[in-house]
């Protein structure tokens, strides 16, 4: 890579403390079926984003939902609070099919009564990663990694210079690009949206 003058951007992981509820467990239905071969799987998680210039706290929080089979991001929510509403408001934005699996880690929001009742009303099945196995939720984790390495040259510095509204606008723009323009080599260079259209026709 050096001979070609190429530089590979590697984002350093930052440790953040997240509330987990290990007392509530659900079967890992997804079972690393990353391409949704056996079930119609949707994955969700929350990521920490450095606070914009007009927010007086260390982080803001983003919840997102990805479709395993097509890799399309179907909804996201940005909030000042990492609470149940962050996740539940996002789930309500997604038009799920009649039968689906929603996979997550053991974040406290995903074991809350409100969340579990919502998934039941939507006729979905809850799936949870094994404790301490981040790879079980690889698809959404990978998307967050792409977001933080490809959205800006320096994600943290860029975010800290903008307002919360500007951040939300940039996130909308990035996700639109990710879904509609970012081609996936694994799937013959189709975009997530193209794969989603094919999936919906079946």
Segments predicted by a language model, with ranges:
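RNase H-like two-metal-ion nuclease catalytic core shared by retroviral integrases
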Residues: 17-21, 104-106, 112-116, 126-150, ...
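Mobile genetic element proteins and their domesticated derivatives, centered on retroelements
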Residues: 1, 30, 45, 71, ...
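Basic, flexible linker segments flanking DNA-binding modules
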Residues: 1-38, 191-201
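Generic structural signal for secondary-structure transition and capping sites
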Residues: 6, 35-39, 96-99, 124, ...
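Active-site beta-loop-alpha junctions of metal-dependent nucleic acid enzymes
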Residues: 58, 76-97, 101, 111
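Short small-residue beta-strand/loop micro-motif enriched in glycine and branched aliphatics
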Residues: 70-76, 127-129, 153-155
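C-terminal domain-tail junction helix/linker
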Residues: 113, 120-122, 146-202
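An active-site-proximal beta-strand-loop segment
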Residues: 35-74, 80-81
């Amino acid at each position: 890579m050096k001979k070609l003058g190429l530089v590979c951007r590697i984002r350093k992981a930052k440790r953040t403390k997240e509330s987990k509820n290990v007392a509530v467990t659900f079967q890992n239905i997804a079972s690393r079926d990353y391409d949704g071969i056996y079930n119609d799987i949707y994955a969700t998680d929350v990521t920490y984003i450095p606070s914009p210039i007009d927010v007086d706290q260390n982080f803001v929080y983003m919840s997102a939902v990805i479709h395993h089979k097509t890799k399309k991001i179907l909804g996201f929510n940005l909030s000042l609070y990492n609470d149940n509403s962050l996740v539940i408001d996002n789930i309500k934005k997604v038009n799920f099919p009649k039968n689906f699996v929603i996979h997550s880690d053991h974040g406290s929001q995903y074991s809350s009564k409100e969340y579990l009742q919502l998934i039941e009303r939507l006729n979905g099945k809850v799936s949870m990663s094994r404790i301490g196995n981040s790879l079980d939720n690889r698809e959404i984790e990978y998307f967050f990694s792409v977001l933080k390495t490809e959205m800006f040259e320096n994600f943290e510095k860029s975010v800290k210079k903008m307002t919360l509204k500007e951040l939300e606008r940039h996130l909308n723009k990035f996700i639109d690009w990710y879904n509609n323009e970012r081609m996936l080599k694994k799937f013959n260079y189709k975009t997530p949206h193209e794969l989603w259209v094919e999936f919906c026709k079946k």
